[in-house]
Amino acid sequence: MDILIVFAHPDDETVFIGGTAALLSERGARVHYVCATRGEGGEVGEPPVCAAHELGEVRSRELACAVHALGGASLDFLGYVDPPVDADGNGRAFAADPKQLAKHIAQAASACQAQAMISHGSSGEYGHPAHSLLHQAALRASQGSPGACLPLYTFSADFPGHPRRDRSANRNDPADFVIDVRPWMPVKLAAAHCHRTQEALFVRRASRLAGHLVPLADVLMSVESLHRAWPTCEGRPEDALADFLRNRCGEALLASPAGWDEGQA
């Protein structure tokens, strides 16, 4: 099957869903990646990997490296420009007309003949405005698909043992699938290492929260989760991606989201 992962910045594909993406590719799915921006407003690395004006080009190459590591089938960009962080260091949304953004996502889904789409959650994970903007646009694209039949799943869905529940779980998106990606952590880590300009940021944030130095391997979550945002459902989702996960990836699925022990992550 063909699956489209659409996200705001280079590295979101690895941080939030990299293990699951690697699993899906390994089991025969064609996973396509579409990034809204080239991450022009991010950090340049410590020590600097490039000059600020080169960052978009460099991060595009980093993303291509990560997609290759994850076994991706294709990579494309929507061409929006990632703005610099604000004076307090908070991320900002890129400039986009919501309807046009949704149209671009729908075109990308059509181009790769996606049978399901995965994107940011309703809370923007940790409240990032660009993530929230992408979520709304992806939802609009899914709802406007022919017959409104393109399922949309969102990552970092909430469940009781979510290892980042207080920091990056989408608390209004209950998990329909919780995936133990520990066997795919070497692939996820390889993809994370592709994002050289952002490695210091990953480690710095996690270390500040932990109160001690945290290596990159321990920054990455070894459990990931998905919520079906559209069509809405109560109980067991039934669609092409749900069937693929159950039939091809069953051993990685937790029987119950509540069954995950936070200490395992």
Regions found by a protein language model. Give the residues of each.
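Active-site rim/loop-helix segments in enzyme catalytic domains that contact anionic ligands
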Residues: 1-112, 140-144, 244, 252, ...
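Metal-dependent de-N-acetylase/amidase catalytic core
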Residues: 1-4, 89-265
